[in-house]
Amino acid sequence: MPPRTSLFTPVLLVGCFIIMVSFAVRASFGVFQIPIAAEFGWLRTEFSLAIAIQNLAWGVGQPIFGAIAEKIGDRKAIVIGAVLYAIGLVLSAGSTTPLEHQAYAWLVGFGIAGTGFGVILAVVGRAASDDNRSMSLAIATAAGSAGQVFGAPVAEWLLTMMSWQMVFMTFAAAIMAMLLTLPLMRAPVTANKAELEESMGQILVKAFRDPSFTLIFLGFFSCGYQLGFITAHFPAFVTELCGPILPGGVLHNIGITSTSALGAVAISLIGLANIVGTLTAGWAGKRFSKKYLLAGIY
């Protein structure tokens, strides 16, 4: 009988931590919509455009960082992503115009690409055994949802003690601090020399000729479209739609004392449900046909 390989390897644990921190920050941006717009008198559309640019940069950046990881190594790609992420947050903290905020959103978006699913899941998948791969990928994906669970409430809590600019600076420091765990992330390189020498154009042409890739691409597009809209606007929507939270009520008694805190908790609940769904999908993916399972989810 072959030796039983561990599910929770150092690569998986570090990968989960990096994704969790990265997505905690990303999921919190909707919390800042009202304070930033109120301070500078911006329109909601101006803030929304910055979030849209950030998501666009995240999408464009994922294949770029995938190529960087294959050329120079996963850990170096993650470092580049984290540095861009932190710089984008620091510059955004000093921005006073919508144009500046939108320009720096490109850096933040590319930073998310370098520290998010595209790079991390590839490393986790290579490091996992065949038996554990499906569950390892599910756990790493669920770590992103775990970041969403605490990211927005932490941002809202920090806003009660400091300005949104200082919260951005704090998040930038957290992004850089997570790099201290990188030495533990080592995974075998499986690409051969011919694959490494392929250009980005060749890889994209090959990918889009595969019907399975195209269907998965469209599925991710629909998922990302909805998720991006919810994380950007749902906290502000809840904050402005709900009436004041009265002392003695159920919400007040469990620590939710303002509508802005309720908006942050609403994002957390979505992330919590996502964790359950992701882990369930990972468990089911080991036992049932993945393509039919994915079709059923959509």
Where are these regions (language model features)?
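Residue-level signature of mid-helix packing/kink "hotspots" within the transmembrane helices
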Residues: 27, 55-63, 148-149, 271-279
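Extracytoplasmic
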Residues: 10-44, 62-65, 229-236, 244
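Helix-to-loop junctions at the C-terminal end of transmembrane segments
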Residues: 61-73, 277-289
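Cytoplasmic helix-loop-helix junction between adjacent transmembrane helices
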Residues: 105-142
